[in-house]
């Protein structure tokens, strides 16, 4: 188990991620209120028919399966449902796009916080004078060099299709559970809530994913700068010690490599946590971090070697 000293920049990154997640939740809560009105209006069209069918069910005139099949055919399908489903999906994608823009806006600040902490640590260790950086400078750098960090992007058509499937599946699922049509714990409310929660969860995970990328990129930039100035460092991967850490990252805990080289994670080269050049399962929603220290030097003493 790695035992790195306190890491103020990583803690600051975590705080900013938490604050960003709260803003994302508010975005989706606002969107859900508008969507809920539209969904309720759609389901109200079927209120009288649904009551009649339920009375038939209670009277034993139709079976529960026949009642469910009627609901599926009348409520969960057809042109009107497609219009509703598409509107829900498109509106959720708009919210996702806004969330992604907020994530991208936070990344330069995270990059700068982590760059500056590591620069100060190296300057203390090495007696160097690596200059610090401001978030505004990172923004300019990012415009000039697109690979400074991984910019989050939204595939609109893919996201709309995903939201559409989620909403359809939630309506079908709640119909199959034979919930009431309207009301607090109804098909209507549960369906929109489930669709919104899935989209919101994805947006929150994106926040963690890309701010971790910014953290790592800021730190790596300092390590590279130090190496160019003749200061040889090594970096260590640190994982979060809980039951949520993925197996591949648990194996990386405490692994140390030269600061300008890459870690080998499950057979893939990675600059550090959140490196999106690796397959997504190795960086999506990553909570790991990396730190650096002065590289040990080996000097000859007579015929023996001494490590200092």
PLM features: what roles do these ranges have?
Residues 1-198, 202, 293-308:
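N-terminal leader/targeting and assembly helices and adjacent pre-domain segments
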């Amino acid at each position: 188990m790695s035992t790195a000293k306190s890491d103020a920049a990583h803690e600051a990154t975590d705080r900013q991620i938490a604050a960003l997640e709260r803003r994302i939740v508010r975005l989706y809560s606002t969107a859900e209120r508008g969507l809920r009105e539209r969904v309720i209006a759609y389901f109200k069209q079927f209120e009288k028919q649904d009551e009649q069918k339920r009375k038939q069910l209670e009277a034993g005139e139709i079976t529960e399966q026949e009642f469910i099949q009627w609901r599926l055919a009348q409520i969960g399908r057809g042109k009107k449902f497609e219009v509703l489903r598409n509107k829900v999906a498109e509106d959720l994608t708009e919210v996702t796009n806004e969330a992604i823009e907020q994530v991208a806006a936070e990344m330069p600040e995270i990059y700068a916080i982590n760059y500056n902490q590591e620069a100060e640590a190296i300057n203390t260790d090495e007696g160097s004078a690596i200059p610090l950086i401001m978030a505004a400078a990172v923004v300019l750098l990012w415009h000039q060099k697109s690979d400074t960090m991984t910019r989050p992007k939204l595939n609109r058509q893919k996201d709309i299709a995903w939201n559409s499937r989620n909403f359809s599946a939630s309506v079908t699922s709640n119909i199959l559970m034979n919930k009431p049509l309207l009301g607090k714990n109804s098909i209507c409310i549960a369906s929109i809530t489930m669709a919104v929660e899935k989209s919101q969860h994805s947006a929150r995970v994106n926040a963690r994913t890309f701010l971790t990328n910014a953290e790592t990129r800021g730190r790596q930039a300092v390590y590279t700068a130090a190496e160019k100035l003749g200061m040889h460092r090594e970096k260590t991967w640190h994982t979060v010690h809980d039951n949520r850490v993925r197996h591949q990252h648990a194996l990386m805990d405490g692994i140390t490599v030269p600061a300008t080289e890459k870690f080998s994670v499950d057979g893939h080269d990675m600059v550090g946590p959140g490196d999106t050049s690796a397959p997504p399962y190795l960086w999506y929603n990553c909570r790991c971090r990396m730190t650096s220290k002065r590289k040990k030097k080996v000097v000859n003493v007579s015929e023996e070697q001494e490590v200092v």
